[in-house]
Each structure stands twice: as structure tokens, then as C-alpha cells.
Amino acid sequence: MSIMEVEVVSSEQKIYSGEATFIVVPTVQGELGIYPRHEPIMSLVRPGALRLTVPGEDKEVLVAVSGGVLEVQPDKVTVLADVAVRSAEMDQARAEEAKKAAEAGISQAKDDKALAEAHKALAAAIAQLKTLDYIRSHKK
């Protein structure tokens, strides 16, 4: 079985660092599936569910990413995410409330900094909601 190293890092912390046999990353071009020995590429990440297939694990490792940059090398994948949250740390009600608060923040922003922060919060909430939707739709 071929493996690659994967690093998922947010601006606050390292979310995942380890091996994977397959990774799906939501990019601006669509979902990108990456196996070991993939051609080198770079892409922008869009809000959504990043999915990792880890050797020895029965379930995928899911991480909500709100945007960022993806770098793929033949033996390593790095995702530098604006905001990233593991699925175990997500809650539907909190994510919906965060989305509403971010939307209100966008409409009430008094300056560019407040607007940018509200957009970042909205992207993070949307990413979590998309990841939770993925989990619900793929329950066995």
C-alpha cells in the first residue's frame, strides 16, 4: 500500500499530521482526489470537507476547512487552511448560530477589517455545515 505524508495546518494550530493513502480536498476547481505519487500542483482551497483515508482506520478522518492553499508533492500534501476544525469538534447548532452571527456581522461591518473578519467567520461556519452534511449523508 502506497502512503503519503499529510499536514493540515490552520492559522491557530496543526490539525492533522500523519500518513494517508488518499485525500479529497475541496478546491476552487472542484473536489480534488489525491493518491501518493501525484503530480505536483498548487490550488486554492474552498470551504468544505477535507477527507483523509488513513492506514489502519475504518472511517475517514474529516476536517472542515474554510479556505486556504493546497500544495501537492509526490510524497507529501500540505493544506494551509484559514480555519480548520476536526469533525469531532463540530456541532450543528453552534455552526448554524455562527453562520447567522457572521451574516449579521457582514451586514453591520463598519470597516474593512470587521468585514474581512465576518467573511472569515462565515466561511468557517459554512465549512463546518458542509462537513456535517457530508457526515449525515454518508452514515451507514
Swiss-Prot record:
SUPFAM superfamilies listed in its UniProt record: Epsilon subunit of F1F0-ATP synthase C-terminal domain (SSF46604), Epsilon subunit of F1F0-ATP synthase N-terminal domain (SSF51344)
Chief place of localization: membrane
KW Transport (keyword) present: yes
Compartments, as annotated in UniProt: Cell inner membrane
Protein topology in the membrane: Peripheral membrane protein
A GO term from the CC aspect: plasma membrane
One Pfam family recorded for the sequence: ATP-synt_DE_N
A GO MF term: ATP binding
Keywords (A to Z) from UniProt: ATP synthesis, Cell inner membrane, Cell membrane, CF(1), Hydrogen ion transport, Ion transport, Membrane, Transport
Coiled-coil regions listed in the entry: none
Classification via InterPro entries: ATP_F1_dsu/esu_C_sf, ATP_synth_F1_dsu/esu, ATP_synth_F1_dsu/esu_N, ATP_synth_F1_esu_C, ATPsynth_dsu/esu_N
Assembly information from the UniProt record: F-type ATPases have 2 components, CF(1) - the catalytic core - and CF(0) - the membrane proton channel. CF(1) has five subunits: alpha(3), beta(3), gamma(1), delta(1), epsilon(1). CF(0) has three main subunits: a, b and c.
Homology family: Belongs to the ATPase epsilon chain family.
Described function: Produces ATP from ADP in the presence of a proton gradient across the membrane.
This protein's name: ATP synthase epsilon chain
Organism field: Neisseria meningitidis serogroup C (strain 053442)
